[in-house]
Structure formats: structure tokens, C-alpha cells
């Protein structure tokens, strides 16, 4: 069985993904701020470095998959936290364990966002993240940004993350490591429970083509099943994909975009 590392697997989508993988007999390592198998603040360079070092110590023979799921919404939290955790907390963790993935021909999956959130993304912010490696400098530039527009920076980090996957996947794939993104729809998690009123209004204004019983939001298991699959060897032909698991919302909003 495989070794699967998941960030942010204490609750929500991450916890459900971990549950599915464990039921299938895999070893799962949860990296989270609290309550994880490895406790680390992935919004800091020091926290990431510590987690990466521990993974190398525990699994010198390699790991089968890295699922970068940890993140924070844009509701009333510092902009610096949104950027450091959502973007650098994913990309730098993925880079930090690349050699472990390469040893086993593994895969990496990151959590992006669906079309509703991406519509709020600012291309200048996404470009800054994708094209400048200096995290400290970026945080300096956004230190005075009002947290009230955190949803814009949330969307921008997730857009940048999806673009990072597209840019990096050809090189990673040529070295035997697949890199993909999952773009969840509106899911019933603690993050969506704490949405700002304007965020919830925007979410509820778009009808979801696929109905999930009486529930207005998807169950985390819908996302977790897709995440567990795309991280597995059964998805060996999938690389560089941003997979929308949203009940058809992306198709509704972007019906003319075929790829």
C-alpha cells in the first residue's frame, strides 16, 4: 500500500480524503496546524521546512502522493495569511517533497477553486505570485491591504495555484511525477460556514446544475473521492489537469470553453 501525505486533513475535504485512503489500506500522514500527525504552521517558511525535514526523516525511500489541501478562506483574516498558506503553503511543500515523490513515481495534487471564486481573481495579484519567488517581498507589498477584500486575494491565490500546476506539470511529468489540481464546487465545510455575507450571496446566486438531494452544498466526500482517485496510480495518464468537481457549475458559467 502507498504512503499519502495530506496537508489540512484534520477536517473537511482533507479529513474525508484521509478516511477514504485509510479505508483502502494506505498509510496517511496528516500535516496540520493542530491535531495532525505532523503539526506545522505551513503559512511560515520555518513551519514548512520543519514538516519537509520530518517527512524526509520518516520516509527516506519516498512517498506515493502529496495532497496540498490546507488553506484559508478570504473572510476577515490577514491578506498575508491567505497568500502564505494558500499559495506558498502548497507550492513550497510540493517542491520540498519532490525528491520523495520522484523516488516512487508518485503524484502531487493541490486544491484550487471553482469558477465562482476564480471570477473574483485579480490577474495582477496572480501574476505577482506566479512570477516572483520572493515571498517576503510579496508580503511586504500587501501588508496594508484591507482584509475586507480578502475574498479577492483568496481567488487570486487559487487562480495562481492552478496556473502553477499547468506551468510545472510538463517538467514534473517528464521526471515521473504527476501534478494536478482539484477545483471544488460549493462544499459544506467549516470554510464555507464562515463565509462573508457577500461571498455567500455570490455563491447562492449561481444555480448548480447537478442537484445533491435537498442540500444546497456538496458533501466533502464528492471532492475527496476525486482527490483520492487523481492522486492514485489508477490516474497514471492524468497530468497537468485542473479537475472541476463542482456539479457542472464550470460548464454552466463557461459553456463555450471546451478546454
Swiss-Prot record:
Annotated catalytic residues: 154
Top-level enzyme category: oxidoreductase
Enzyme nomenclature, EC number: 1.1.1.-, 1.1.1.52
Pfam (any one): adh_short_C2
pH relationship of activity: Transformation of DCA is more efficient at pH 10 than pH 7.
Residues bound to NAD(+): 32, 154, 158
Keyword Cell cycle annotated: no
GO-annotated biological processes: bile acid metabolic process
Lipid metabolism listed as a keyword: yes
Keywords in alphabetical order: Lipid metabolism, NAD, Oxidoreductase, Steroid metabolism
Record field: catalytic activity: lithocholate + NAD(+) = 3-oxo-5beta-cholan-24-oate + NADH + H(+); deoxycholate + NAD(+) = 12alpha-hydroxy-3-oxo-5beta-cholan-24-oate + NADH + H(+); cholate + NAD(+) = 7alpha,12alpha-dihydroxy-3-oxo-5beta-cholan-24-oate + NADH + H(+); chenodeoxycholate + NAD(+) = 3-oxochenodeoxycholate + NADH + H(+)
Gene3D superfamilies: NAD(P)-binding Rossmann-like Domain
GO function term, MF aspect, one: 3-alpha-hydroxycholanate dehydrogenase activity
Job of this protein: Involved in the modification of secondary bile acids into iso-bile acids (3beta-bile acids) via epimerization of the 3-OH group through a 3-oxo-intermediate. Catalyzes the oxidation of deoxycholate (DCA) and lithocholate (LCA) to yield 12-alpha-hydroxy-3-oxo-5-beta-cholan-24-oate (3-oxo-DCA) and 3-oxo-5-beta-cholan-24-oate (3-oxo-LCA), respectively. Is also able to catalyze the oxidation of cholate (CA) and chenodeoxycholate (CDCA) into 3-dehydrocholate (3-oxo-CA) and 7-alpha-hydroxy-3-oxo-5-beta-cholan-24-oate (3-oxo-CDCA), respectively. Can also catalyze the reverse reactions in vitro.
Family designation: Belongs to the short-chain dehydrogenases/reductases (SDR) family.
Protein's recorded name: 3alpha-hydroxysteroid dehydrogenase
Protein's organism: Eggerthella lenta (strain ATCC 25559 / DSM 2243 / CCUG 17323 / JCM 9979 / KCTC 3265 / NCTC 11813 / VPI 0255 / 1899 B) (Eubacterium lentum)
